[in-house]
Curated annotation (Swiss-Prot):
Protein name: Ribonuclease P protein component
Family: Belongs to the RnpA family.
Cross-referenced NCBIfam families: PRK01903.1-1
Pfam family membership, one: Ribonuclease_P
Amino acid sequence: MYPGMLSEKRTNALPRGEIARGKSAVSRLFSQGGRLKGGFLLLIYSASRPVEQAPRIPVRVLFTVGKKLVPRAVDRNRIKRLMREAYRLEKNILTRALAFDAGKGDHQVMLAFLYRARADAIPSLERFRAEIRHMLKNLLSNRLPQTREGDRIE
């Protein structure tokens, strides 16, 4: 196989199951979720009972870029790729802190990263990583709801 071929197994990719899907779940996240503002990203988050399709996935994530802010599809796709890669590299902050065990985990965290800046200068991967790292640490420090036992989901 040649490097980069589609049939090659991608071990470092963000798993499909971690991508938030479903109109009802996404609309519930946008209507009821908490918000964290960053420099050029907005994070919408909520912790809830796991959905039936993915009960063992502790975190589901969504990436979006508005067409009004970034009119060219090429730029929107590049920004989403950068956000996905930055999240993939920084998600261990969240997954380690959640210490999710499939047998006892009773919450699922849903995240939506929204790009809020213009397409004039697309931030670098390092800037995306720094922004996402800061947002995830802020989310863990004081934003996630309490569990049934009264302990923070950490």
